[in-house]
Amino acid sequence: MLAILKYKAGNQTSVRRALNHIGIPNVITADPAEIAASEGIIFPGVGAAGQAMDELTAAGLDAVLKEQVEAGKPLLGICVGCQIMLDYSQENDTRTLGIIPGECHLFNPALEDETGAPIRVPHMGWNRVIPRKPCALFKGISDDAEFYFVHSYFPNPQPDYVIATTTYGKEFCSVHGGPGLWAVQFHPEKSGRPGLKLLSNFHAYCKEAANAQ
C-alpha cells in the first residue's frame, strides 16, 4: 500500500487515478499511523512553495515526513513536492523541508531555447529526462522517453544528489535524491506510459524494501 500525502497543496486525485490504473493499492491520507504503516509515500504538490509549506506545517505533516524519511521509508516527491524537499526555494523566499541539500531557483526568462528564441516561463510541455547515474525509478524506461513538466522554478541540489537532468534554456536537475528518496520535477501521473512505469518501479522498490525488513 502506498500513502499519497493529503494536504491542500497537493494534486492527490490525479496521482491516485494513475496508481489505480496500474493496480497499485493506495490511500490518500494525512493520518500519521496510516503513513507509517504504508510501504512508501508519494508527496505530490501544485501551486507555490510558500503555500505548500504553510499547509504542510499547519497539518503537522512536515514533521511526519522527516520522521518517516529518517526511519527509512521510501519517498517520492512530485513537482512542488520535489522542490520543497530541498532546503530553500526562491519562490516566496521560503525555507523548505531540508530533506535533501540544495535550493530551488526561478528560470531566467532571458535564456534561449534551441532555436534561439527566449524560453517561456513557466516551462510547460514534454521533455526528455536523461539519467546521470543508475536509478531504480528508470528501470525499463527508454533514454528517449519524455515526461510532462509544468513549473517556473527548478531544483538545484548539491551535485551528489543529481540523478537526472533536462534541458530547457539550460541543463537543470529534473530528478534528485538517492536510493529510496527521490524527487521528480515532472508529473509522472500525467506522462503516459513512461510515467506509469516510473510509478510502478517506485512501488516495486517499496515492496522489496518492506519485505527486506
Swiss-Prot record:
Q: Could you tell me the keywords of this UniProt record? A: Amino-acid biosynthesis, Cytoplasm, Glutamine amidotransferase, Histidine biosynthesis, Hydrolase, Lyase
Q: Where is the Glutamine amidotransferase type-1 domain?
A: 1-212
Any one GO molecular-function label of the UniProt entry: glutaminase activity
Would the keyword Amino-acid biosynthesis be found if you checked this record's keyword annotation?
A: yes
- Stated EC number for the protein is 4.3.2.10, 3.5.1.2
Q: What is its main location?
A: cytoplasm
In this UniProt entry, which cysteines form S-S bonds? none
Please cite one Gene Ontology biological process associated with this protein.
L-histidine biosynthetic process
Q: Which reaction does it catalyse?
A: 5-[(5-phospho-1-deoxy-D-ribulos-1-ylimino)methylamino]-1-(5-phospho-beta-D-ribosyl)imidazole-4-carboxamide + L-glutamine = D-erythro-1-(imidazol-4-yl)glycerol 3-phosphate + 5-amino-1-(5-phospho-beta-D-ribosyl)imidazole-4-carboxamide + L-glutamate + H(+); L-glutamine + H2O = L-glutamate + NH4(+)
Q: Which residues form a coiled coil?
A: none
Q: Where is it localised? A: Cytoplasm
Residues of the active site: 79 (nucleophile), 187, 189
One GO cellular component term of this record is: cytoplasm
Q: What pathway does the annotation place this protein in?
A: Amino-acid biosynthesis; L-histidine biosynthesis; L-histidine from 5-phospho-alpha-D-ribose 1-diphosphate: step 5/9
Please give the HAMAP family that the UniProt record associates with this protein.
HisH
Q: How does it assemble?
A: Heterodimer of HisH and HisF.
Instruction: Summarize the protein's role.
Output: IGPS catalyzes the conversion of PRFAR and glutamine to IGP, AICAR and glutamate. The HisH subunit catalyzes the hydrolysis of glutamine to glutamate and ammonia as part of the synthesis of IGP and AICAR. The resulting ammonia molecule is channeled to the active site of HisF.
Q: Which NCBIfam families match?
A: IMP_synth_hisH
What this protein is called in its record is Imidazole glycerol phosphate synthase subunit HisH
Taxonomic source organism: Oleidesulfovibrio alaskensis (strain ATCC BAA-1058 / DSM 17464 / G20)
